[in-house]
């Protein structure tokens, strides 16, 4: 966390070279860019001199990249609060005052937009690719793409290290144009104002680890440290940085930018790296070719606890090809052949991380066969506040339950569950997970279920992107008693949704149905609907439009129907019931 040290920043000695004077050390080199936003003394005060932790030995391979001026001018961030704390210290993209920070009155980074999603996933994220704006590259997104963007943003709460490492290298290599990253010139990044172009590119490249099917498995499996050094010795003299370097261990993973190799003698080598937690500083990964081992120590920031990755503690090290990161990735939500389900979760408060267990079950409640899914950990080390949750890839055609068991929780614990698949996705938001509880969320092609061992208030969303129209149905039982099972059954061909539960007393529900097409969007909601025991809600939206509400009833056990009113979601209604209505991609 930067906040703890922000008020101690003072003007002290400058540690970057004067304008026009080249510096051949491994931290900085070339001409400094003009237009400094941050006084260079800030970096000296926070991160120490450029020689702290620097590589040692004789340079035997050098790409020419330097953390200054080719790295980003502010450190890695995770949550919106982290980003605002960076803005307080570094003034980027706009200065945040302490009063604004304390009052939560600051601008958070925008989620991935249509242009960024198209660059990563292709035009299938657009509802109608023919409607792409030729000037801006934007389009109306399918609902699944909006939910995917939200998932990537949620997954990055542990940090954007992979995106920062890849973007800095790709910019230096000329693989990304400067205006796509917001830099002042080709490869010159030190004066980057860190506006929306930088945020969009960093975030979408961070998301590549969720989307490229072989990226995380290869990074986690690792490779021989000795062979890795030989690869860098062979490729870096070409004047580009072809790889992101990843380390992975029990504490999680990290991604950094390798740009030079130094020979320390006696079989020891230092790999000079730009670690995006330490702007403008050269750090070293040490490799012992005698034992084919490595060692690297880093931290979220200089004031936080450090993490060590090494062969001794069974960590792995790998190179990820920048070309693979920049390539168009398979789209897990675009309309087309079922590629399986990408299951993702919001990050956990670090204080709770050891108390939360995630399992997959069959619809009958038995453990799901392990050959039907694979689990991977994103390349994010835990921060002082957040720890990333795993990613789970489930084979096509598999219906399953997600079980989340909580032990003794030390902090407030909301949870989001994303189940993303081609054309149809599901989402669960639980504002508060209770200690010593278990929740179960069922994911199927046309049904969703929920149950908890403690009282709760789940919000369940199902999405479907058709050829011309996208639909979004939501159910929110308020004050759901423990052990009560909730069902949300969606007959998409008949355009009907049934909301039911096993409750033995009256429950109160919010239900919402949204239709989106190129001509516009219409959303209808019924709020605080009382539903007696054994009754259900039936919504028929087959004839609904922007001006015609869906038909809706509370259907009693004896099949008696009581009509219920659904009202159009308007700006004024959103203002009045902001905490109870869904945006298109969910309530987050």
Model-derived regions, located:
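Conserved active-site-adjacent core of cysteine acyl-enzyme catalytic domains
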Residues: 167-253, 263-266, 276-278
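Active-site-adjacent structural segments surrounding the nucleophilic cysteine of cysteine proteases
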Residues: 21-191
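Bacterial N-terminal signal peptides
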Residues: 2-13
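Extracellular structured ligand-interaction cores
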Residues: 156-162, 240-242, 253-256, 268-270, ...
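Short linear interaction motifs
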Residues: 139-152, 226-229, 236-246, 335-339
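Sec/Tat signal peptide C-region and signal peptidase I cleavage site
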Residues: 16-19
């Amino acid at each position: 966390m930067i906040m703890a040290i922000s008020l101690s920043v003072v003007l002290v000695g400058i540690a970057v070279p004067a304008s026009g004077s080249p510096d051949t050390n491994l931290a900085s080199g070339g001409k400094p860019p003009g237009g400094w936003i941050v006084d260079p003394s800030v970096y000296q005060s926070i991160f120490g001199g450029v020689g702290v932790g620097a590589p040692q030995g004789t340079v035997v391979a050098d790409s020419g990249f330097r953390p200054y001026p080719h790295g980003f001018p502010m450190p890695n961030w995770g949550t919106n609060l982290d980003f605002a704390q960076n803005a307080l210290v570094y003034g980027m993209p706009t200065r945040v005052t302490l009063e604004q920070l304390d009052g939560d009155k600051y601008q958070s980074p925008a989620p991935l937009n249509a242009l960024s999603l198209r660059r990563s996933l292709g035009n299938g994220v657009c509802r109608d690719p023919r409607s792409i704006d030729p000037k801006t590259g934007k389009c109306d997104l399918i609902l699944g793409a909006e939910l995917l963007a939200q998932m990537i943003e949620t997954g990055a709460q542990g940090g954007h290290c992979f995106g920062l490492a890849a973007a800095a290298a790709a910019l230096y290599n000329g693989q990304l144009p400067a205006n796509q990253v917001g830099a002042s010139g080709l490869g010159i990044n030190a004066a980057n104002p860190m506006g929306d172009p930088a945020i969009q590119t960093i975030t979408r490249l961070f998301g590549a680890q969720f989307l490229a099917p072989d990226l995380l498995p290869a990074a986690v499996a690792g490779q021989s440290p000795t062979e890795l050094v030989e690869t860098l010795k062979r490729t870096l003299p070409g004047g580009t940085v072809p790889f992101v370097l990843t380390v992975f261990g029990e504490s999680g993973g990290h991604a950094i930018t390798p740009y030079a190799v130094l020979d320390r003698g006696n079989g020891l080598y230092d790999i000079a790296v730009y670690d995006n937690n330490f702007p403008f500083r050269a750090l070293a990964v040490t490799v012992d070719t005698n034992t084919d081992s490595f060692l690297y120590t880093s931290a979220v920031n200089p004031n936080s606890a450090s993490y060590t990755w090494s062969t001794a503690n069974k960590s792995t090290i790998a190179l990820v090809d920048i070309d693979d990161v920049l390539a168009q990735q398979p789209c897990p939500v675009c309309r087309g052949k079922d590629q399986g389900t990408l299951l993702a979760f919001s990050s956990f408060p670090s204080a709770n991380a050891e108390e939360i267990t995630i399992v997959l079950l069959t619809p009958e409640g038995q453990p799901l066969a392990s050959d039907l899914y694979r689990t991977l950990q994103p390349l994010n080390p835990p921060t002082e506040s957040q720890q990333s949750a795993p990613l789970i890839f489930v084979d096509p055609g598999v219906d399953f339950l997600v079980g989340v068991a909580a032990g003794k929780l030390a902090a407030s614990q909301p949870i989001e569950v994303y189940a993303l698949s081609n054309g149809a996705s599901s989402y669960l938001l639980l504002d508060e997970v209770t200690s010593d509880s278990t929740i179960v969320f069922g994911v199927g092609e046309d049904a969703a279920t929920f149950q908890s061992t403690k009282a709760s208030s789940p919000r369940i969303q199902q999405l479907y992107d058709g050829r011309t129209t996208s639909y979004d149905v939501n159910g929110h039982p308020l004050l759901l008693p423990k052990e009560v099972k909730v069902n949300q059954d969606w007959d998409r061909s008949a355009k009907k949704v049934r909301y039911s539960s096993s409750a033995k007393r009256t429950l109160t529900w919010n239900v919402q149905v949204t239709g989106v097409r190129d001509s516009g969007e219409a959303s209808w909601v019924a709020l605080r609907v009382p539903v007696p025991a054994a009754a259900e809600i039936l919504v028929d939206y087959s004839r609904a439009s922007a001006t015609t509400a869906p038909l809706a009833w509370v259907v009693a056990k004896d099949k008696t129907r009581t009509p219920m009113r659904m009202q159009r979601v308007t700006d004024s209604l959103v203002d009045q019931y902001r905490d109870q209505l869904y945006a298109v991609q969910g309530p987050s």
